[in-house]
């Protein structure tokens, strides 16, 4: 029960006694000298979760409270006691008392609607209007002059410095093999067409690094994958935000009609069937009807196919508008010279303009649908914010790329040279047949003698005779066999063994290892461990008479083939002695593979990043010795069905690792002098969201086992989720996280069993299955059927999870996913048509829909954070702008003078966002433990953790640490500097004297309690 704090207090030395006369209760609290902490009694709920202090509660939930029935409370206590989570000591946090920025409405819900609309306008109104207009007729001929040319509705043509419209569709074309900078751009507004031509293209400048000018007053740019077009606009390259905003039709399509990754293979097969059916319509081919039947069968089995398409403009225009785009002209822009472009210039401008027109037609169709699917203004507002991200760099960027590439080439050459030496040595055995046949590695190779090269007529020297395998690897220019660590020859030349058994290549199974048939005990043990034996029927080339062959295990499971035992995922097997070699260079090859894996996969994307330097444009920063540049990430604000942002370099960049070449990538993003990065990671974001969904059924935080473990679990006592899972499985706490998040996203028993066996190769299949079953019974629970009594009460006849720590959560998630039109509980965002149950067969893509419920809610969280920061930056004139977001992480670039105010703004944004989640799920309370970020980072580089030194094989010099500030530390900094958003002062506040329980029970409550009881104790 909660009671109000009395304003009259008696102070004595370091102790303060608060007398609550209403209940004759004496509170004895240690006095704090900090002005932002008071002596109010802690507000701890009936199951032991501390709520917001009275001062914060009254500001975030003004005159609001939440009551639960005694039956709900009793059930929650029984459930927690069953899982040994009741009556644990509460983690006690200070009673904070400071003035928050005022809510922009009577409730936190009103507040978010209003601040979402604040940033959305006037752009939202412009976009709505623009989606209803028709554009002028497209010009047939285009003037050949540099810069912008305006083609007005009345037929007049004029040279303009930039388009003067405040809303337009925009598209650019580049000679991508020559330069990332644009050569042609077209735009269309309600009143005019515009065309921009590069001065370099027309021979008016020697510099191909030409940026496109836009209106300094700002405009709304609509485009398909519009971030690509944004990268070519001059005004976007400045330390200060431009007044432009960008609306991406690709994101609008994905959010309304996008498909998940599991659906795409089916979509491509269906399209192939459709194309075949169309191509035979006019023919008299007997097969034409069967092709059409194929396509109709696809539609019958997968109705969602008629409601979705992949994301390219060509496919989206066809799907929404039945516009057939001819993209063959795109090949002309692959030219290495500008002359071919000039010869077809009018034709190519028309091609670009037709894409622009088609984008507007798509926009007219999809934008109204988007507003129905995502009706909250905060979603629209956040989407615009994501379109404004930017990354500052200096010349350390160039040094990084050059240095890593040089080291990468050196490491590759070191291993390749050794492999070449082994090949040279092995080829000399061509005349020693017995030696080759006795060698389990060399006998796999093709030893057919052949001439190394053709003999010239006048040549006197004999042509060397070599084995056929050597000839295939021979390079004439280098005059030696060139063999890389990725080659199939490498494991053979390195004499690799799996558990002391030679490796062999199978075209069917990939890399396998041979065990002599006489080793029956070992064969039985390998079968118990789940290793897959090879079948003679599948691959007849292996020697099954003397050996049993097993597939080399793969991290993706028994179905996957090992393509290279020298890839980074096999390094741990080498260190554990499972994978062996006679040669030291094998270890080097594996180390190189692990070290270079990041750079080899990302180098093309990293090296092709478009950097605009201070010599190219006025970037708003004083010149410095180390220079200054800006990268605009090519981000799709809503690139997945869960509305997550997508970008292929910065949103997928790994954190720096000591053995990973080039992994210091993010730390190459550096704030210029006078600026700093301020950011934070949301603590256990998705875990808290699903726990809240479970707790909301009781209207009490910590009512479910998962909720209690998330809010009050202690690592030291083993009561947090990861420690509990680690204890069940006998794995480390870090390993347990993989199992927990995998289960949350739909991983089943099969995947968990496989993961256990990967972590412990000695574990038998039966043992791993038993452990996995034990984990799922304890967490997700067991499948139960709805009893007749519950059905008579009006509950549907279905199965549900019961008795587990997470049963309440999974039942809630699955119930959400099975709704005809599921929506996120917070911002009311709907699922795409491709995953809507009305367009699916029964239970189809259930895992994807459950994932959608979780991840889409997490996207709502990010959007609310961004909208909150937009409001606070504007209201308090903070010198800050969004730099980058990565799912549960936000980073702002702030001036040094405002960095602590921005840090405080982030804490307020998090408090508001968590509170809004709670209110939307029916609880007008917020646990103190999650109200604020555990810390806000203030740093001069971009990195996951301010304490990371970012030392890697390519970066030997540690990067100095940044600051890591808790909410108390931030408040202390503001107090010391005399800065804050609102005056840093305590406020008088009261919390109503009300019990948390209510005797009122409705019939609906009885039904819900009966179902909750079944989930807990069935």
UniProtKB/Swiss-Prot annotation:
Keywords: DNA replication, DNA-binding, DNA-directed DNA polymerase, Magnesium, Mitochondrion, Nucleotidyltransferase, Transferase. The keyword Iron-sulfur does not apply. The gene is mip1. In eukaryotes there are five DNA polymerases: alpha, beta, gamma, delta, and epsilon which are responsible for different reactions of DNA synthesis. It catalyses: DNA(n) + a 2'-deoxyribonucleoside 5'-triphosphate = DNA(n+1) + diphosphate. GO terms for cellular component: gamma DNA polymerase complex; mitochondrion. It holds the Pfam family DNApol_Exo. It comes from Schizosaccharomyces pombe (strain 972 / ATCC 24843). GO terms for biological process: mitochondrial DNA replication. Belongs to the DNA polymerase type-A family. CDD domains: DNA_pol_gammaA. Its cofactor is Mg(2+). It is found in: Mitochondrion. This is DNA polymerase gamma. The keyword Lyase does not apply. Involved in the replication of mitochondrial DNA. It comes from the Eukaryota. SUPFAM superfamilies: DNA/RNA polymerases, Ribonuclease H-like. One of its GO terms (molecular function) is DNA binding. The lineage of its organism: Eukaryota, Fungi, Dikarya, Ascomycota, Taphrinomycotina. Its EC number is 2.7.7.7.
């Amino acid at each position: 029960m909660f009671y109000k704090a009395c304003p009259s207090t008696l102070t004595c030395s370091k102790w303060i006694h608060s007398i609550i006369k209403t209940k004759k209760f004496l509170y004895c609290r240690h006095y704090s000298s900090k002005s932002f902490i008071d002596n109010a009694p802690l507000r701890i709920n009936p199951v032991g979760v501390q709520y917001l202090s009275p001062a914060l509660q009254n500001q975030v939930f003004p005159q609001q409270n939440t009551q639960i029935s005694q039956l709900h409370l009793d059930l929650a206590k029984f459930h927690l006691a069953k899982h040994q989570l009741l009556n644990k000591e509460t983690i006690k946090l200070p009673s904070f008392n400071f003035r928050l920025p005022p809510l922009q409405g009577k409730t936190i819900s009103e507040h978010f609607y209003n601040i979402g609309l604040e940033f959305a306008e006037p752009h939202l109104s412009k976009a709505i209007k623009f989606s209803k207009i028709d554009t002028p007729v497209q010009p047939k001929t285009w003037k050949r002059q540099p810069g912008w040319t305006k083609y007005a509705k009345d037929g007049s043509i004029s040279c303009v410095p930039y388009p003067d419209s405040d809303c337009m569709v925009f598209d650019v074309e580049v000679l991508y093999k020559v330069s990332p900078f644009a050569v042609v751009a077209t735009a269309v507004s309600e009143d005019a067409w515009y065309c921009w031509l590069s001065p370099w293209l027309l021979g008016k400048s020697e510099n191909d690094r030409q940026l496109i000018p836009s209106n300094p007053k700002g405009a709304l740019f609509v485009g398909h994958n519009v971030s690509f077009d944004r990268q070519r606009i001059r005004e976007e390259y400045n330390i200060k935000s431009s007044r432009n905003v960008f609306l991406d039709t690709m994101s609008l399509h994905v959010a309304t009609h996008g498909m998940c990754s599991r659906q795409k293979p089916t979509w491509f097969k269906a399209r192939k069937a459709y194309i075949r059916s169309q191509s035979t319509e006019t023919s008299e081919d007997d097969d034409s009807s069967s092709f059409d039947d194929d396509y109709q069968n696809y539609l019958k089995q997968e109705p969602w196919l008629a409601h979705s398409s992949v994301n390219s403009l060509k496919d989206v225009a066809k799907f929404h508008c039945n516009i057939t785009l001819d993209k063959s002209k795109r090949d002309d822009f692959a030219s290495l010279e500008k002359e071919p472009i000039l010869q077809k210039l009018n034709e190519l401008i028309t091609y670009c303009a037709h894409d622009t027109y088609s984008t507007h037609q798509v926009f007219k169709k999809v934008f109204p649908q988007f507003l129905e699917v995502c009706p909250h203004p905060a979603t629209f507002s956040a989407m615009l914010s994501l379109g404004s991200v930017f990354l500052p760099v200096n010349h350390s960027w160039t040094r990084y790329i050059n240095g890593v590439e040089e080291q990468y080439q050196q490491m590759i050459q070191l291993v390749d040279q050794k492999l070449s030496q082994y090949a040279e040595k092995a080829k000399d055995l061509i005349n020693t047949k017995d030696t080759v046949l006795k060698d389990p590695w060399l006998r796999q190779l093709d030893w057919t003698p052949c001439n190394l090269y053709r003999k010239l007529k006048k040549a006197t020297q004999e042509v060397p005779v070599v084995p056929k395998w050597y000839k295939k690897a021979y390079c004439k220019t280098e005059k030696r066999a060139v063999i890389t660590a990725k080659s199939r020859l490498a494991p053979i030349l390195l004499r690799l063994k799996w558990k002391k058994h030679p490796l062999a290549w199978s075209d069917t199974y990939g890399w396998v290892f041979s065990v002599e048939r006489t080793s029956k005990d070992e064969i039985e043990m390998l079968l118990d461990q789940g290793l897959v034996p090879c079948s003679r029927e599948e691959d007849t080339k292996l020697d099954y008479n003397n050996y049993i062959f097993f597939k080399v295990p793969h991290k993706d499971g028994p179905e996957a083939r090992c393509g290279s035992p020298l890839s980074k995922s096999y390094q741990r097997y080498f260190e554990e002695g499972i994978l062996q070699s006679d040669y030291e260079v094998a270890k080097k090859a594996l180390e190189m593979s692990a070290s270079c894996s990041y750079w080899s996969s990302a180098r093309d994307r990293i090296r092709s990043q478009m950097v605009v330097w201070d010599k190219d444009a006025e970037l708003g920063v004083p010149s410095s010795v180390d220079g200054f540049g800006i990268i605009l990430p090519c981000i799709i604000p809503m690139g997945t069905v869960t509305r997550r942002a997508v970008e292929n370099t910065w949103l997928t960049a790994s954190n720096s690792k000591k053995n990973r070449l080039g992994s210091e990538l993010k730390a190459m993003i550096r704030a210029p002098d006078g600026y700093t990065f301020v950011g934070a990671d949301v603590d256990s974001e998705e875990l808290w969201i699903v726990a809240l969904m479970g707790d909301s059924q009781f209207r009490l935080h910590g009512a479910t086992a998962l909720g209690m473990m998330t809010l009050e679990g202690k690592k030291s006592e083993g009561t947090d989720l990861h420690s509990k899972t680690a204890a069940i499985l006998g794995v480390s706490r870090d390993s347990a996280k993989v199992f927990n998040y995998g289960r949350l996203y739909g991983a089943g028993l099969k995947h968990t069993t496989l993961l256990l066996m990967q972590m412990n190769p000695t574990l038998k299949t039966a043992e791993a299955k038993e452990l996995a079953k034990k984990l799922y019974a304890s967490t997700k629970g067991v499948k139960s059927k709805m009893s007749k009594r519950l059905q008579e009460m009006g509950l549907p006849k279905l199965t549900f999870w019961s008795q587990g720590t997470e049963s309440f959560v999974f039942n809630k998630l699955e119930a959400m996913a099975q709704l005809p039109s599921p929506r996120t509980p917070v911002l009311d965002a709907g699922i795409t048509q491709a995953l809507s149950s009305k367009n699916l067969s029964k239970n189809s893509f259930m895992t994807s829909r459950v994932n959608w419920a979780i991840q889409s809610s997490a996207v709502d969280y990010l959007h609310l954070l961004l909208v909150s920061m937009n409001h606070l930056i504007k209201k308090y004139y903070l010198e800050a702008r969004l730099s980058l977001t990565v799912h549960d992480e936000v980073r702002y670039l702030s001036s040094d003078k405002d960095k602590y105010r921005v840090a405080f703004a982030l804490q307020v944004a998090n408090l508001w966002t968590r509170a809004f989640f709670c209110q939307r799920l029916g609880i007008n309370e917020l646990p103190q433990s999650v109200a604020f970020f555990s810390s806000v980072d203030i740093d001069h580089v971009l990195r996951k953790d301010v304490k990371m030194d970012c030392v890697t094989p390519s970066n030997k010099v540690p990067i100095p640490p940044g600051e890591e500030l808790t909410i108390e530390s931030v408040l202390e900094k503001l107090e010391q500097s005399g800065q804050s958003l609102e005056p840093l002062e305590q406020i008088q506040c009261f919390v109503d004297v009300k019990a948390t329980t209510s005797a009122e029970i409705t019939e609906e409550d009885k039904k819900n309690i009966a179902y909750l009881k079944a989930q807990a104790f069935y």
